[in-house]
Each structure stands twice: as structure tokens, then as C-alpha cells.
Amino acid sequence: MAFPRSDVAGAPAQQVPVGQAEPPVAPITVKIVVAGGFAVGKTTFIGSISDIEPLSTEAAMTEHSVGVDDAGGVSDRKTSTTVAMDFGRIALPGDLWLYLFGTPGQDRFHFMWDDLITGAIGAVVLVDTERLESCFDAVDYFEARQIPFVLAVNCFDGVAKHDLDAVREALAVRPEVPVFYTDARNRQATKQALITLVSLAMARMQG
């Protein structure tokens, strides 16, 4: 994966004296947003892949969410929710750092999305097939702004319950949008989801 550096074209290379260590190279940073509905697994996704201790702004569920944030049976076991964002970082070969920002899932915090998406190359939209309607807002948001995104169907129990073509049809996404299974708890699965998004974003930038 090659992202452009900000080096000045034609500038002479600096000579490093013998025996002196090469100066550290500033990493190339890439911002990615992890989105989706309430209780879909965004915090878990970032936590499974981050090289650093994830920053999570979670708060206890309150009566304010009743009738507003429907997570079906998930509400029975979910006692906290992200109220601002989740943040994590993963370092890849070639001095490439991926900064991961998770959106708050509750509807009343959607006003923060514009700030979180600023500067991002794209988004991973997590999908819960038991509550497809919960990710409609995310899909509509990124499509309306022509921001590259992928749909990662989260297999909560490690079992794929719905066909990917059926999910694509239900969400009415364009054929070029990647739709695939993932497991937000599994580092390798989340890494593959991020690689798929970066590849899509690079292809879009290259025309």
C-alpha cells in the first residue's frame, strides 16, 4: 500500500554521518471510521485490533435510551454505550498507522458524525442481520457524501445467519460496495476488514 508523502520534490537527500543513526521517519497516518447501529460491535471491533489501549467514552445506559435506542434482546445484556467516540490505532508495515474512530451508536449522538468523519479515507459499517434497519442511517450517510465504505456483517455467535447477497439487496447498496462476514472479536477478521476498506479507498483515489 503506497500513500503519498509530503516530501519536497527534488530536494537533495541529507547525508547521515558514519556511525550516526538514521533520523526517525514520520509515519503515514490514515483515518478510518467504524460505524453502525447501536450495540452492533464497534467498540469490540476497535478493541480487538488496536495496538494501544483503546480510548472508549462509554457511559451507563439510562432511562433516556428507552424507546430511542432499540437493540432488541441486546439491551438486556448491554449496560453501557459509547457517548462520544472510540479510538484505537494499528501500525502496519511501511510506517503506516491506521487511526480508528468509532461513532456513537445512539441516534441522539449522530450530530457528532460530521466531526468524526473529517479527514477519513472511508468507513467500515458493521451490520447486525437481526437488526438491519439499525445501519440504514450509516449507509445513507456515507453514500450521500460519496465516502468509500464497506459492509462487514458481524457474526455475533460465529455463525453466518444470512446470505451476503440477501444482505446487499436488503440494504440496497451499489455492486461495488464490498459486503463480507466478519467477527468483531477476532483480530485477524477485523484486520482483513480494514485492509478491504483501504484497498477500496486507494482504488477510488486512483480513479
Regions found by a protein language model. Give the residues of each.
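Conserved G1/Walker A P-loop phosphate-binding module
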Residues: A2-S75, T79, G88-P93, W97-Y99
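Alpha-helical scaffold elements adjacent to nucleotide-binding pockets in ATP/GTP-utilizing enzyme cores
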Residues: S48, G119, A138-Y141, A166, ...
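A structural signal for isolated positions on well-ordered beta-strands in alpha/beta enzyme cores
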Residues: V33, V150-L151, F180
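Conserved NTP-handling cores and scaffolds of large molecular machines
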Residues: I49, E53-S56, Q146, A201, ...
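Conserved C-terminal guanine-recognition region of P-loop GTPase G domains, centered on the G4
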Residues: V125-E176
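Canonical P-loop GTPase G-domain recognition
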Residues: D157-G207
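Switch II of P-loop NTPase G domains
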Residues: T79-Y141, K161
